[in-house]
Amino acid sequence: MTSKKPAQQKRASQPRNVDKTRQYGKDWERLSHSGRYDMRRLKEAMLLLIANDAPLPPEYLDHELTGDWKGFRECHIGGDFLLIYDLRESGLIVFTRTGSHADLFE
């Protein structure tokens, strides 16, 4: 199907390639079964990161980590609900951990 939009408005960057750690999968299952966390909101943040269209909106408080987690990034899904991910130069995004501060840093 063709579009009447100018070519510039039809261009987009490719979505990022995605991977996840085994621990991330375990975190997802644990949090999903607990019923305390909005997993749909987590999926929304993940899709924004994968889409690669723009930085996450400010409400996610996306930032680089330091110390043992240097090289990783963290965003706040809501309250004390976090997503840790690794954004590599190759364009690969690896979802590494998710949970509360206590789950991830203590």
Residue ranges with predicted function:
Residues 1-79, 88-93, 102-106:
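Basic, Lys/Arg-enriched alpha-helical interface segments
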